[in-house]
Amino acid sequence: MYLGIDIGTSAVKLVCAEADQILSTASVALDVSSPEPGWSEQHPDQWWQATCRALGQLSGRIALSEIKAIGLSGQMHGAVLLDRNKRPIRPAILWNDSRAVQECDDLRAAQPQIGHISGVLPLPGFTAPKIAWLRRHEPDRYGQLAHILLPKDYIGLRLHGALATDASDAAGTLWLDQSKRAWSPDIAKATDVELDWLPPVFDGHDIVGTVTAEAAAETGLPAGLPVVAGGGDAATGAVSLGATESGRGFISLGTSGQLFVADKVFRPNPERYVHAFAHTLPDRWYQMAAMLNGARPISWIGGQLGFSAAEVVALAETVSGDRLPIFLPYLTGERSPLGDPHIRGCFYGLEDSTTRADICRAVVESIAFCFADAAQSFGDTIDSLPELSAIGGGSQSDLLLGLIATTIGKPIVRPEGADSGPAYGAARLAACGHGALSMTDLADQPPETDRFEPGDPTALTARLNRFRALYSAVKAVD
């Protein structure tokens, strides 16, 4: 039995699995703090406390003593800043934080070729510009800085006491030279970072430590249990689906959204803000369009109207038509393919007759339109894919998957365990590190439970064109 721990933005999720079957899951919700407009933070100890609580839930259903190894997964890009005692000096600055706009401009000027080294152009959500921001705006805290980790790696530190990361999570910092899978001294220097602040980089299935006696006492896990490096949530989601070989892709619908295509070569496309990153497995890379808002607008509008996410989708299913409002879902700016941290959301086309169902439909459609824009940014790469799998909480919506299939013109497959993707992928990496699975086994794809074929695109194409025109108009005003 193998344990996968995924440090998400909205929850810590645990999956206990055999090599090819999920046995049990647990989840503990997380809160996000926004002390200033555009800021997004979580304290790393909140992740640890939630992990311990989730393990407590899991222990009521399975024997933790039977776990053979642990794999880690987590939200990418978060800046976990530690002092010499390996304790946090401030809350972590998350992937959807937009404070470091000026620092991104400075980094582009200092490193004009950064997109072809780091695989993407600088944007505020990435880790590197946040350190330059810290030096400029919080010099006392910058002076305490001795180690920089990513969210899942802090949980690794609490479990086994070692500083470590993997290539796929390191890829999202901007400090990684993607083709070499090693830290770039020049980019580190340009962002006021010492190389010895950054952890060693491993492959995702490498064992990097074992559970300490102290961690065992806090979690109920056996001391000495091996822990593998794991991966960023995009890469572990890929491992859960067998998207480790060229020509396989998927969409992820969580708080953020991703369109992911595996590759055997490093293929940068920075001009369209398509991320070209190292995979968590050796000699593999991927291209990914990353959307900051994903399925989050559904929960956002639900919060405004007093509905659950499921109720929003159910209402959206009751209406359709060209006179519905258009919604821009850019609640925290947008990354792929716009590279626009300043754009914000809005409704256009509200009328006296507009209903709550109309508004809900507009919000759900907007997510599909974002994926259509993302697919377009890939060019010919996306055309070669026969289908795309779907994971994440938003993948449970038949309406949303059908809309995405139609807007991008590809069948969408919902596999078994779709809502547990990254945590399950982390468990599979643990099984690989322990010897129960081979690299070849990790390419196995789970059975599909549902399939969504593209529908008639005519009506949606007209609304998609209005969606794109609305972005251009709002950007001009902004």
How does the language model describe each region?
Residues L3-G4, K13-C16, D105-F126, A132-A164, ...:
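Active-site core segments that coordinate phosphate-bearing ligands/cofactors
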